[in-house]
Regions:
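Glycoside hydrolase catalytic-domain context in secreted enzymes
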Residues: 1-179
């Protein structure tokens, strides 16, 4: 982040997005900027793969953490959003990814996981919120995480075979990635 001031963070983030993506008037994208880490935490601390930000109040979430992301999505038209690590994994958090990001803010571009974040759902001594890679991967895609930085999504075929996710749901993510 650029600091704890939501307005300053928003303005600096918008300048970076505009500088990277351009003004959007060209035939092709200049490059994709990525707003990260949505939302609340993905710091460099040693415990980021087991950290739990449950002490963040709804007021703090809405007044401190979300304003910069909202500005980057609605004003900056950022092309990618990276979901954060957290004990309740942000990469499978339907409130953050579907209700707020996609429905309330109208975001229809790419959501990417931070590296290893989907693995944290099931790796021993990490978050351990899901029993297997297939369950974790299916939940992440259903929740709106289109692209994974890691190897867990290789289990999506198994997830389809087990009925954890449909091919149509996977195709939604694939289409966003290929646009």
């Amino acid at each position: 982040t650029y600091g704890e001031d939501p307005y300053l963070t928003s303005q600096m983030g918008l300048a970076v997005v505009k500088g990277l993506q351009g003004d959007g008037t060209g035939k092709y994208d200049k490059t994709h900027a990525c707003a990260k880490h949505y939302a609340v935490h993905s710091g460099p601390e040693w415990n980021r793969h087991s950290f739990d930000s449950k002490n963040i109040s709804q007021r703090d979430l809405w007044e401190t953490y979300l304003p910069a992301f909202k500005a980057l999505v609605k004003e900056g038209k950022v092309k990618e959003v990276m979901c954060a690590y957290n004990r309740e994994p942000c990469c499978s958090n339907k409130q953050l990814l579907i209700r707020i990001l996609r429905e309330d803010w109208g975001y229809d571009d790419i959501v990417v996981s931070d590296c290893g974040a989907i693995g944290d759902f099931y790796y021993p001594n990490h978050h351990e919120t899901h029993p297997t890679a297939a369950a974790a991967s299916a939940d992440a895609v259903v929740s709106g995480t289109d692209l994974e930085c890691g190897g867990s999504y290789s289990s999506l075929n198994e997830a389809v075979q087990k009925g954890l996710i449909s091919e149509e749901k996977i195709n939604e993510s694939v289409f966003r990635l290929l646009r």
